[in-house]
Every structure is written in C-alpha cells, then in structure tokens.
UniProtKB/Swiss-Prot annotation:
Positions annotated to bind Mg(2+): S47, T182
Originating organism: Homo sapiens
Keyword annotations: ADP-ribosylation, Cell cycle, Cell division, Cell membrane, Cytoplasm, Cytoskeleton, GTP-binding, Lipoprotein, Magnesium, Membrane, Metal-binding, Myristate, Nucleotide-binding, Palmitate, Transducer
Disulfide bonds: none
Family: Belongs to the G-alpha family. G(i/o/t/z) subfamily.
Keyword Methyltransferase carried by entry: no
Lipid attachment, kind N-myristoyl glycine: G2
Modified residues (Deamidated glutamine): Q205
Positions of the G-alpha domain: 32-355
G4 motif: annotated segments: 266-273
Source species taxonomy: Eukaryota, Metazoa, Chordata, Craniata, Vertebrata
Region (G5 motif): 325-330
Subcellular location: Cytoplasm; Cytoplasm, Cytoskeleton, Microtubule organizing center, Centrosome; Cell membrane; Membrane
Entry protein name: Guanine nucleotide-binding protein G(i) subunit alpha-2
Amino acid sequence: MGCTVSAEDKAAAERSKMIDKNLREDGEKAAREVKLLLLGAGESGKSTIVKQMKIIHEDGYSEEECRQYRAVVYSNTIQSIMAIVKAMGNLQIDFADPSRADDARQLFALSCTAEEQGVLPDDLSGVIRRLWADHGVQACFGRSREYQLNDSAAYYLNDLERIAQSDYIPTQQDVLRTRVKTTGIVETHFTFKDLHFKMFDVGGQRSERKKWIHCFEGVTAIIFCVALSAYDLVLAEDEEMNRMHESMKLFDSICNNKWFTDTSIILFLNKKDLFEEKITHSPLTICFPEYTGANKYDEAASYIQSKFEDLNKRKDTKEIYTHFTCATDTKNVQFVFDAVTDVIIKNNLKDCGLF
C-alpha cells in the first residue's frame, strides 16, 4: 500500500513537470531574444547600420523600395552642391570660371521646386555638373571641414551622369549612402544564428536624446557608433563643440550609466575609410592637442580607441568590445556583426550559467 502513488499526487507531479517545462522554454525563448540599442552622436552611421541589417539579414531592398529612395538621392545631391556653393561666399572662394556665378543663381532658383517634386530635371543636372567641375567649387569642397556637408556629397556628385538618367533606379549602395535625419525611434527585427534581434535606432542629435530613456529596460547590448572622421568637425547643432568631444562625452555617460551595469557595450569606430583619407592632411591635434604620434591611420585610430576605452570606469568588471567599421561596406559590417553576435551568445550563456 505504501508504494502506491495516488492519482492526485500523479496529477500534481505532471503539473509540476509541465510548469518546469514552460519555465525552461520561456527562459530559452528569452535567451534567444536580443534587444540591441544603437546609440551615438548625430551622423555617426547608426541608420546605415540598420540599412545593412536589412541587406544582410532580410534580402535587401526590392526594386520598388529602391525606387522610393530616388527623391532622397536627388535631395541629398542638390543639398550637397548648395552647401558647397553657399560656403564659397563665407570662405571667400571665387569660381575659377566667372560664368559659373550664373549657374549658381540657376541652382538656387531651380532647386526648391525640384526638391518639392522629388525630381532632377535636365537643366538642373546640367547646372550641378558644370558647378561640380569648377576648380573653385573643388577647392571649397576640399575645405569641407569648415562647414556642414553630407559624407555622401562626393559619392553622388561624382556619379551625377548615372543619377541624372531618366530611368534611374537607386542601387543598394545608393540607398546606403542616403542621409535622412532620424527623428524618434526606428525599430528593426531580424533573425540570425537562431537569435531574434530587435534593433532600435535612436536619433543622435541632442534634441532627440530625451527619447532614449524608455528604451533602456531589458537591453541585451548597446552598439555605440562613433564617426572617426568627425575629429576635425563641429556639431550641426552647436558650432562651438567638436564632434569627437561630444561623442566622448556621450559615450562616458552611456558606458558608466547605472542602467547599463550588466549590458554589453560594443563600440563601432565607424567611417574608417573617410578617416584614413583625411588623417594624412588634417592632423589629429585639431581634436587632441596632446597627441604626439604620427598622422597615420593605424597610430591615430589606436589613439582614438584608447581615448574612448579609457572612459570606462569599471574596467575590472566591464569590457568594451571595439570594432573598426565602414558602415557603407556590406562585407565589413557582415564580418563585424558576426563577431558581435558571438559575443552576445557567449554573454547570454554566461548569464544562464552555461559558460
């Protein structure tokens, strides 16, 4: 008699087993859900990383989606040449060919309607082409650190002939290079290595930062983007503030924030291609007067890396995972994101006591 298990006990044991199973499944599901927060100052490349996730993990942009970016490409191209021509007045640079002054007047007369309609008419593309070929305009472009200019300016202006075709459809690379200021929070979902990612891209300009706070809860990792090439630039919203210094200030507040004690911090030192180009003729001492190294990519990039990593006040318990990136290079982003995912998996296993 003593060995007999009552029907009630059996049912209770089954219920207990089922609860354990559900808890285990919920735990496994939670461990497979990854919430990534993309942070960084304005124009550091966050939105480009999000676009790359669509290209790498979601079959990219369809022809119809690319077509919808045509007006943005036109607008970015028009805004870029206008910014350069406006800066010529401030920097007192003349056109090499005086007749380009007429083209400049035409540019400002035609651009407003073209942008409103999302088009690039032949007369306007001709004006832009002639202006971009002028040596005075090129001299002003060479001094672009002295005013605000899109990173994609030369990319679009050098390819104007293709962009101005009547049957133009933007390529994936054209879409990656588009610049639209992020306002609010953009959420992207994708699956990779059996993990379900939710990625949040947050506006980087100062006015956008107050919107970050409610995204903080339950974040698995933060990807903090820094534009390496911004070391000699000032902010669009505060022309007294060096962009790199602003980025460091922001990284300090994120890295040492009590909200993020247990959050993996991944540092993307981005725009390495632009930095490599720029460092040979624009010294790092503009940003860091104490720098005594060579104005060469490896040495200067390592110095910036150490400046950011040194801001971490919890080095004994918190590791910063740093990667040098070029957000417009799909292969590079794919390689880096693969490494980032491995770190997330490893840290998830640690949290579950399995590593």
